[in-house]
């Protein structure tokens, strides 16, 4: 195994123009496998089921990922004891973060991958806690990342650039490279700050890599990063670009992204992007100048492999996972059925409009679009579980807003 520090670092790779491939969506993948609870989406599985987390890391590594992101999404102390999710009573936030770092490092050392320690938005910010309090939460995670000597840091999944800036400022205290991504679309963050301005603020706070992750489909994320790039150029601020989108089609989303869709989170399967969609995304991102290209919720290892295969000419090699995957379906030449063998060609898959097989379902949905954000009563943090009356009130609101 390669010793820690022997590999080229993140900025060394990006400065040289190399493509860095991120991994995929751990919370969604592990929820489907039975290791994460939908709702809180917290990562205690790192402690409770380390073998499941380790295996998913390995699958992304085999698919071509250069980064093993620690499974520390929503691993802040306040999130681990929020709305009846009493994880912190059994497993400390420190323990979750430590074990997640160890697993990521173990797998990263099996290949040419870096370890990224990640923090994300907090219930405390949404509850209007002070900058000092919110930064204190990030700093607890950072202490673990420094102790475990991660290679770089990611502030990801922020709906408000203000909180993301606070996270970047804390992570910069480590002296390690920092990447920062917002879960926003072309309309900007939930306070109306444009993507271009968001990118400038993140870069000025100390992020060497800026971009978007989650909430929107691949091509929407590319469009958003294009606006970020334009903002950076106009402000004469330099930063590398990064995209880690959903693996779901979201043309009907509002400002909040896929969380507003009525199918979220248990009926999103008809929206899953194909591996061929990901080829198009990877090429579009690369052509825009993005060099850190990965995925988020819904991204499985075969999606990551599609990025690696599309950009194999630029990278100079294919991932190990391609040993069992013929380029553009060429492996179908071995199929028993002749009509399937006839599909062993690129133009077939590029031109195919996949059917959903659901004749009585709409192709688009109407987003809920409640419009609540930081400071709203329904977003205030509470340790106690949602009460029956609170749930009744929400259902009543839902009925009013739907009408």
From Swiss-Prot:
Disulfide bond residue pairs: none
Return one Gene Ontology term, BP aspect: methylation
Annotated Zn(2+) binding sites:
214, 296-297
| Highest taxon listed in the record's lineage | Eukaryota
Q: List the EC numbers from the record.
A: 2.1.1.5
Hcy-binding domain residues: 8-311
Enzyme class, broadest EC rank? transferase
Protein task: Involved in the regulation of homocysteine metabolism. Converts betaine and homocysteine to dimethylglycine and methionine, respectively. This reaction is also required for the irreversible oxidation of choline.
What is the name attached to this protein's record?
Answer: Betaine--homocysteine S-methyltransferase 1
Native species: Xenopus laevis (African clawed frog)
Write the gene name: bhmt
């Amino acid at each position: 195994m390669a010793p820690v520090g022997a590999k080229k670092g993140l900025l060394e790779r990006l400065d040289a123009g190399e493509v860095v491939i991120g991994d995929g969506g751990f919370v969604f993948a592990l929820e489907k496998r039975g290791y994460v609870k939908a709702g809180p989406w917290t990562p205690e599985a790192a402690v409770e089921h380390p073998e499941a987390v380790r295996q998913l890391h390995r699958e992304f590594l085999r698919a071509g990922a250069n980064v093993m992101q620690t499974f520390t999404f929503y691993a802040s102390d306040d999130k681990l004891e929020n709305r009846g999710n009493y994880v912190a009573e059994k497993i400390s936030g420190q323990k979750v973060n430590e074990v997640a770092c160890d697993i990521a490092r173990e797998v990263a050392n099996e290949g040419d991958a870096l370890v990224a320690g990640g923090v994300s938005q907090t219930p405390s910010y949404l509850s209007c806690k002070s900058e000092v309090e919110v930064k204190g939460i990030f700093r607890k995670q950072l202490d673990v990342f420094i102790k475990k000597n991660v290679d770089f840091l990611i502030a990801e999944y922020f709906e408000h650039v203000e909180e993301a800036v606070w996270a970047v400022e804390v992570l910069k205290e480590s002296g390690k490279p920092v990447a920062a991504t917002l879960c926003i679309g072309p309309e900007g963050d939930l306070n109306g700050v444009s993507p271009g301005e968001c990118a400038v603020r993140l870069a000025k706070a100390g992020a060497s890599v800026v971009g978007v992750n989650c909430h929107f489909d691949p091509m929407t994320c590319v469009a958003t990063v294009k606006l970020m790039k334009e903002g950076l150029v106009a402000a004469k601020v330099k930063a590398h670009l990064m995209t880690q989108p959903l693996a779901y089609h979201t043309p009907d989303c509002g400002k909040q992204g896929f969380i507003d869709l009525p199918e979220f989170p248990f009926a999103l399967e008809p929206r899953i992007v194909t591996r061929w969609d990901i080829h198009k995304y990877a090429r579009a991102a690369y052509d825009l100048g993005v060099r850190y290209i990965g995925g988020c919720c819904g991204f499985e290892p075969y999606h990551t492999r599609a990025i690696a295969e599309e950009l194999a000419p630029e990278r100079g090699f294919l991932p190990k996972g391609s040993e069992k995957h013929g380029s553009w379906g060429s492996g179908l030449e071995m199929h028993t059925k002749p009509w399937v063998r006839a599909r062993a060609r690129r133009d077939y898959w590029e031109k195919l409009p996949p059917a959903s097989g659901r004749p009585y379902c709409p192709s688009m949905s109407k987003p809920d679009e409640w419009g609540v954000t930081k400071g709203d009563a329904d977003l205030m943090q509470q340790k106690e579980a949602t009460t029956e009356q609170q749930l009744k009130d929400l259902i009543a609101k839902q009925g009013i807003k739907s009408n």
